[in-house]
Amino acid sequence: MQVGEHREILKKGDSIYYNSMAPHGMIAVGGKDCLFYAIVLNPTGEPVPELSRGDILKTLPRERDPQQRVYSKFIERKEDSHGTPLSITFKNTEHFNFAFDIVDEIAKKSPDKLAMLHIGRDKTERRFSFEDMRKNSNRAANYFKSLGIKRGDRVMLILGRSYEFWYAMLGLHKLGAVAIPAMNQLLAHDLEYRFNAADVCAIICTAQGDVTEQVDIAQNSCPQLKTKLIVDGAREGWRDFDEECKLFSTHFDRNENSPGGEDLMLMFFTSGTTGFPKIAAHNYKYALGHFHTAKYWHNVDPDGLHLTISDTGWAKALWGKFYGQWMCEAATFVYDFERFSAADILPMFAKYKITTFCAPPTMLRMMVKEDISKYDLSSVKHMTTAGEALNPEIYRLFEKATGLQILEGFGQSESTMMIGNLTGAPHKLGSMGRPVPIYKIDLLDSDGKSAPTGEPGEIVVDTRNGAPCGLFTGYYGDEEKTKEAWHDGYYHTGDMAWRDEDGFYYYIGRADDVIKSSGYRIGPFEIESVIMELPYVLECGVSAAPDEVRGQVVKASIVLTKGTKPSDELKKEIQQYVKKHTAPYKYPRIVVFCDDLPKTASGKIQRNRL
C-alpha cells in the first residue's frame, strides 16, 4: 500500500482503517482530499523482515552501578538483555517524599552534581546543583511557613519557566502544602473558577505578562486568596518572593509528621467537554510513577543533559523536567523563552551538549520548517514526543537529518506515561507503543468488552488489584466525575485507540471531544460558555478541526439569533471576544455560521458531526 511517500506491506486479511477525526488519518494536500489507492509491492510473497530493536543502547552506555542510585531504596526492576524493563515494582512508599528522599539524598551524596542548567530570556546562564536545590527548597519551605501556609493548603504556581518554580515546588512538598501548577495565559474568568474550585489560599506568580493583573481582578470574588507572591518583579499588594525567601534558613528538618505516601501533594486542572475543568489530585507516590518515563522512554543519561520543551503550567513539565529525571540523577536544561522560535533554540543543542530531547509534535514541525539540517544536533542521542499524534513525514525528516528515530508515548494529567516506545524494544512508526510495566492497559468497546485486534476501543487502566503509582486518586471535590471515570475496576481515560497483533497501540482521538492543539488540551464547554454570552448567539458548538501545524484547532459552529446577519466582521468580533474573556490559545481559529446544530435524541450537541 502506498499513500504519498508512505509504504506499508499488507498481509492477507489486513484492513485499511481511516478515521477523518484522527490526526493519523489525515490524507490531504493543499487542503484538498487525496485519492486513496493501493499498489502491490510484494507480489512474490517474500518474507517481511522482523522489526529491529532500536540501536539507542549502542550509543548510550548502560548504567554502571544502579544499586548506588538513590532511587534503588524505592524501586526494583528487571530488564531483558536489551535493557527493556520487564517489571518495575515500588517499595518503602508509605512515607515517600520526593523532595526529602530523592533531591536531598542526592545532595548529600553528590552535592555539586548539576541538577539544572537554566537559560534566562536575556540568555543569562544559571547552574543549580542538587545542593542548591536542597538549600533553596528549605528556604522556600521556611518562608511559606512564616506566611501561615500550612500542610494541606492549596498554593497555585504560575511561573512559566522561571527557575524559582523548581525549589518552590520542592518547598511545598516538604511543608505538605498542595501545589497547583497553572498556565500564565489564564485570564480573570479562568482564575476565578480555579481559585474557588480548589480553595486556593496563596499564589506564586511571574511578573511577566499581565497575569498578576488578572489575579488581582479574580481575587475580588475569591476572599480565601490571602497571599500573593511575585517573582522577578514588583507590584502593589504582592510580596517579593525573591527578596524575602533568601532571608530564611537553609535548614528544614524532616520529622515523623512530615508529609508523604498517600498524602495529597499535587493538583492539575484538566479540561473536559461537559463542564468546567476537573481537578486531578495526586499523592506523594505520583513522583515514583515517573521513573520509567525518564529511565526507559527519555533514556536520560546521569552524565548528560535532558531537554523537555514545556511550560511549567503543563503536567508535561513534571514528566520531563522534574521527578523522573532527577530520580535518575540526570540534569535538566530549561530555556525561559517568551515565544517558541526554532531558530532561537536549535543552536543551543550544540552549544550546551543536550543529550536527550522531548517536544510536542507542534514544535517538531516548527523545527522542520526551520530546516534542521543547518544545525548541529550530534550531541542528541535520543528523541521522544507526546501530546498529540506525530506526522510520519516529521518522523522521517528528523531521522534523515539526525539518524534518530523519535519515540512516541501516551499519558494524561491524571497519570504518568501509560503507553510508550521504550528503549531497546521494537517500535513501529505511528504507534504510541506498548503498555509500560506498571500499568495494566486494555481497550474496551462500547459494550465494555475487550476490543478485538484492529478495532477501536477506549483506553482503560485495570485497577481491580489496586491503582499503580502515578495514577491520580480522583477528581478533587467531584465525586460524580470520579465515579464516571473510575468504575467497575477500571479507570476510563476517555481516549480512543486501536492495537495491532503485536500489541502496539495507535491513537485515534478523544472520546469526549477534548481538543488537542499545540499540546494544549482545550475543553469545548469553556469556549461555548464565553461565546454564548454574546447577545446575538443563539446556539454554539465547539469542535476540533485538523491543522497541519497545530494538530487540531478550535472550530466554533454558531447559530445566530433571528435578524442577525453573518459576516466576516462578526467572525472577527467573536474571536476577539473569546481572546479577551479566556486564555488566548483557546480562541476559535475557525468560525462558521449554521442554521442549526446536529443533536442527539436527548438534545445534546453532536460535536463529532460539526
Model-predicted segments: where are they?
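Structural core segment of the AMP-binding/adenylate-forming
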Residues: 63, 146, 170, 174-243, ...
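Conserved AMP-binding/adenylate-forming core of the ANL superfamily
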Residues: 112-170, 187-192, 242-246, 285
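Conserved AMP-binding/adenylation subdomain of ANL enzymes
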Residues: 288-308, 312-355, 370
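Conserved ATP/PPi-binding loop(s) of AMP-dependent carboxylate-activating enzymes
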Residues: 438, 449-484, 522
